[in-house]
From Swiss-Prot:
The keyword Oxidoreductase applies. CDD domains: GDC-P. The glycine cleavage system is composed of four proteins: P, T, L and H. This is Glycine dehydrogenase (decarboxylating). It is an enzyme of class 1 (oxidoreductase). The keyword Thylakoid does not apply. GO terms for biological process: glycine decarboxylation via glycine cleavage system. Keywords: Oxidoreductase, Pyridoxal phosphate. It holds the Pfam family GcvP2_C. Belongs to the GcvP family. GO terms for cellular component: cytosol; glycine cleavage complex. Its cofactor is pyridoxal 5'-phosphate. GO terms for molecular function: glycine binding; glycine dehydrogenase (decarboxylating) activity; pyridoxal phosphate binding. It comes from Brucella suis biovar 1 (strain 1330).
Length: 932
């Protein structure tokens, strides 16, 4: 790769000599020959991508530094759901900036995910303690979408027989915007006021409201209870450390943002939202839930619980389309609470509340009218005709306050606010603060009886906290240890140079509603990224707002819906989806108000074009969209893709292109050229944003020219149909993708795609003599991933795909995607970043496992006592005094004899009991009093 800058060669795993050896193994003379065989000529891009030439790491960092230097970072008192924070350095360095945490995948393989599962369990415990509700999920995307998700829970609770939602107080404008977007296709009636009727599914109570005021909701809550409506509290989690828990005053659900628990504003994200519910709602809440179970030896172990609720299983009947959430940020929030403990959290909250109370008192003394009598951190002041002038004066002093309207301003205090700030802000109103520590929060004080669990009291010194985070990280297997060959997940390198800017002050510490002239760096960076993604995909416009791939799907389908409505075709509501589709596809279609019609696939995995044609023609008067993943979820470039698109267009539909497998296309083909009208791009797959152990993700959408007017809007931009709380979604991590594209250039991106395809075909070639490769395209080639049929081991030896997955842990690997899209198989995606040495190690392990299964088939090892059935093996099990197994300890933990013992990964638990964990659901740690 001498023609490329060093970064490209560092990003791509195989060296030049490795590439030649792999091609030789495939019997091919060149990479060009492989691409000609694997990628249909009809879709190939016959020109280079028109992107800026690649830069070195140093030059790209310097250029981005100059761009983001255009941002003017001033101290924000805007509030509206976003607050300044002090991220504890021990958390920033040992968690947020630690690849052991941010390169991990969603913890579906429990045995190699105990560290992050444990911290997410503590996050759920934190939320349950704050809200007084027994069940919390392990994060949602942001506060606005969390409110919408809670409303969805309420409607499902009433079996969709009630559709009216009462907003009982003033929510943040962006929350109302997102709720209205979600309501329209689902037929929710959004009302305001205090009138609860028999059709009301839920009331939404802001606690406090967007003005900072705690209203008197006693009557409307009582009315809701009398009418059977659920009560949803939108509650500030910092305020809840000194206030009565929402469950105490009648909340059935509570939602909010955990951003102020140590997570920077980041110009809007990413941040973890929380959702907690009463026990009766447990099985219909969205998102992932961490539960406690036991392993095969009775040791406590964590796992993802109640997965049958999730979109990948229930599809169009799922409770939500939430897939990727905000695990990394939820873990930061949990660590923040563990670091400070309950007393520390209460000290922060009390100080913030006292600053706000003193500010309110000073304004009142100066004759300024303020909203409400009870408040936590925000003071809303009436300043007839002077709002802009006062805000301008604050700006001159380096502080930003919120202009609510021409006559009203809001000032929100936070953890970073000082006495100097208080004095300066009061002076803008002709006021002078006095001393005191009175707070104005309503109701009973929280007291000391919360977060009594030991973990929130044991890590007061930095030494203890550092070691705590290290111990958790050591339990997990992430990309910093080994290959994660998950099909359809694209676990590629997240380069250090890409990650560094996320922590820059000019990236991390801007409020999303800061004045436009102060965020010109973000404007330039996002404009660059939109243009580059348009060039890569061929589309006319891009929205960066969706903060997960699932939200990109939803945004894209909503753009199609609004397009049809604009042309008087609002009756079009049929969405054709192949039977092989990702589970989010049908879930998103249902959320967008569409009815799903399944298109069959042929035995070779390709879409049945005759079935597609028949169903498109049958529904031609009502056809809205066709959702297709390309390359297919079976890991094959289907030759008929353009014909599929033509059939849909001929029958009045739009083509939605699921970009989950875009890593096989970049630089080789473009969705828009193929015939797609809209496509979402997983920046946390193809474009190097890390998975974070289950989020954050970013799922921007690209659209053809006719759909550009229907891209997501935002209330702050004077438009509608937002799908996320902030205009640019998880804006701060967009710099990762900016850096990746800037350092790779068009030629480097194409080379990465070619390497990904080569790696997958090399794996398929090495394994096909042992395991059938389930689907291949022309010339017996796969795309960037392949499905390995392990059912042959089940047939010959009774060895299940789960046995293989768990045995791979003993070999030092995260298992490939298990039983999807075909039950009993493994789907392997190596990405371009894995070197040949690691790929060979995986292949050697898979071949060795087949050999172990043969020993079971031949009767050498019993079917119920062999290394596969007992996998994974922990150090404590292996060191037990008695060893009664028919295989040796060495065969258990150093299989194949090809491992460096010093590099051995030891799982902390043996196989986790999934069934028992769901039957006996434990998803938070009981308080100390429960053991009395």
């Amino acid at each position: 790769m001498t023609e490329f800058l060093p970064f490209v060669a560092r990003h791509i795993g195989p060296r030049h000599e490795d590439e030649r050896a792999m091609l030789a193994a495939l019997g091919l003379p060149s990479m060009e020959t492989l691409i000609t065989q694997a990628v249909p000529a009809s879709i190939r891009l016959n020109r280079a991508l028109n992107l800026p030439a690649a830069l070195s790491e140093a030059d790209a960092l310097a250029e981005l530094g100059t761009i983001m230097g255009r941002n003017v970072v001033k101290k924000s008192f805007i509030g509206a759901g976003y607050h300044g924070v002090h991220t504890p350095p021990v958390i920033q360095r040992n968690l947020f900036e630690n690849p052991a945490w941010y390169t991990a995948y969603t913890p579906y393989q429990s045995e190699i995910s105990q560290g992050r599962l444990e911290l997410l369990f503590h996050f759920q415990t934190l939320v349950a303690e704050l809200t007084g509700l027994p069940v919390a999920c392990a994060s949602l995307l942001d506060e606005a979408t969390a409110v919408a998700e809670a409303i969805g829970v309420a409607c499902r609770h009433h079996r969709d027989k009630r559709s009216r939602i009462l907003l009982a107080g003033e929510l943040h404008p962006q929350t109302v915007d997102v709720v209205n977007t979600r309501a329209e296709p689902l037929g929710w009636e959004i009302a305001t006021g205090s009138d609860v009727d028999d059709n009301t599914a839920a009331i939404v109570v802001p606690w406090p409201d967007t003005r900072g005021v705690y209203g008197d909701f006693a009557k409307v809550i009582a009315d809701a209870k009398a009418k059977g409506a659920l009560v949803i509290a939108v509650a500030d989690p910092l305020a809840l450390t000194i206030m009565e828990a929402p469950a105490r005053w009648g909340a059935d659900m509570a939602v909010g943002s955990m951003q102020r628990y140590g997570v920077p504003m980041g110009f809007g994200g990413p941040h973890a939202a929380y959702l907690a519910v009463s026990e009766a709602l447990t099985r219909i809440i969205p998102g992932r839930i961490v539960g406690q179970s036991v392993d095969a030896h009775g040791r406590a172990a964590y796992r993802l619980a109640l997965q049958t609720r999730e979109q990948h299983i229930r599809r169009d009947k799922a409770t939500s389309n939430i897939c990727t959430a905000q695990a990394l940020l939820a873990n930061m929030a949990a660590a923040f609470a563990i670091w400070h403990g309950p007393a520390g959290l209460q000290a922060i909250a009390t100080r913030v509340a006292a600053l706000a109370a003193r500010f309110a008192a000073a304004l009142k003394a100066a004759g300024v009218e303020i909203a409400g009598e009870s408040l936590f951190d925000t003071v809303t002041a009436k300043v007839p005709g002077k709002a802009a002038a006062i805000a301008a004066e604050a700006d001159k002093g380096g502080r930003l306050i919120r202009i609510i309207d021409a006559d009203t301003v809001g000032v929100t205090f936070d953890e970073t606010s000082t006495e100097e700030d208080l004095t300066a802000l009061a002076s803008l109103f002709g006021a002078k603060p006095v001393g005191g520590d009175t707070v104005l929060v309503p109701g009973k004080e929280r007291g000391e009886g919360f977060l009594t669990q030991e973990v929130f009291h044991s890590h007061r010194s930095e030494t203890e906290m550092m070691r705590f985070l290290r111990r958790l990280a050591d339990k997990d297997l992430a990309l910093d240890r080994a290959m994660i060959p998950l099909g359809s997940c694209t676990m590629k390198l997240n380069a250090a140079a890409e990650m560094m800017p996320v922590s820059w002050n000019t990236v991390a510490n801007l409020h999303p509603f800061a004045p436009a002239e102060q965020v010109q760096g973000y404007a330039k960076m996002t404009s660059d990224l939109e243009a580059w993604l348009c060039e890569i995909t061929g589309f006319a416009g891009v929205s960066l707002q969706p903060n997960a791939g699932s939200q990109g799907e939803y945004a894209g389908l909503m753009a199609i819906r609004h397009y049809h409505q604009a042309w008087g075709q609002g009756h079009r509501n049929i969405c054709l989806i192949p039977s092989s589709a990702h589970g989010t596809n049908p879930a998103s279609a249902s959320m967008a108000g569409m009815s799903v019609v399944v298109v069959n696939c042929r035995p070779d995995g390709d879409i049945d074009i005759d079935d597609l044609k028949a169903k498109a023609e049958k529904h031609r008067d009502n056809l809205a969209a066709f959702m297709i993943t390309y390359p297919s979820t079976y890991g094959v470039f289907e030759e008929g893709i353009k014909a599929f698109c033509e059939i849909v267009h001929d029958n009045g539909g739009q083509v939605y292109f699921d970009g989950a497998n875009l890593n096989a296309l970049v630089g080789l083909a473009r969705p828009a050229d193929i015939g797609a009208d809209v496509c979402h791009m997983n920046l946390h797959k193809t474009f190097c944003i890390p998975h974070g152990g289950g989020g954050p993700g970013v799922g921007p959408i690209g659209v053809a020219k006719h759909l550009v007017p229907y891209l997501p809007g935002h209330v702050e931009a004077g438009s509608e149909h937002a799908v996320a709380a902030a205009q640019f979604g998880s804006a701060s991590i967009l710099v990762i993708t900016w850096m990746y594209i800037r350092m790779m250039g068009g030629a480097g991106l194409k080379k990465a795609t070619e390497a990904a395809i080569l790696n997958a075909n090399y794996i398929a070639h090495r394994l096909k003599g042992v395991y059938p490769i389930l689907y291949t395209g022309a010339h017996d080639r796969v795309a960037h991933e392949c499905i390995v049929d392990t059912r042959v081991l089940k047939d010959s030896a009774g060895i299940t795909v789960e046995d293989v997955a768990k045995r791979l842990i003993d070999y030092g690997f995260h298992a490939p995607t298990m039983s999807w899209p075909v039950a009993g198989t493994l789907m392997i995606e190596p990405t371009e970043s894995e070197p040949k040495l690691e790929i060979d190690r995986l292949c050697d392990a898979m071949i060795a496992i087949a050999g172990e299964a043969k020993k079971v088939a031949d009767g050498v090892w019993p079917a119920d006592d062999n290394p596969l059935a007992n996998a994974p093996h922990t150090a404590s099990d292996t060191l037990a005094t008695e060893w009664k197994h028919p295989y040796t300890r060495e065969e258990a933990v150093f299989p194949g004899g090809a491992f460096d013992p010093t590099a051995k990964y030891w799982p902390p638990v043996s196989r986790v009991d999934n069934v028992g964990g769901d039957r006996n659901l434990i998803c938070s740690c009981p308080p100390v009093a429960a053991y009395g």
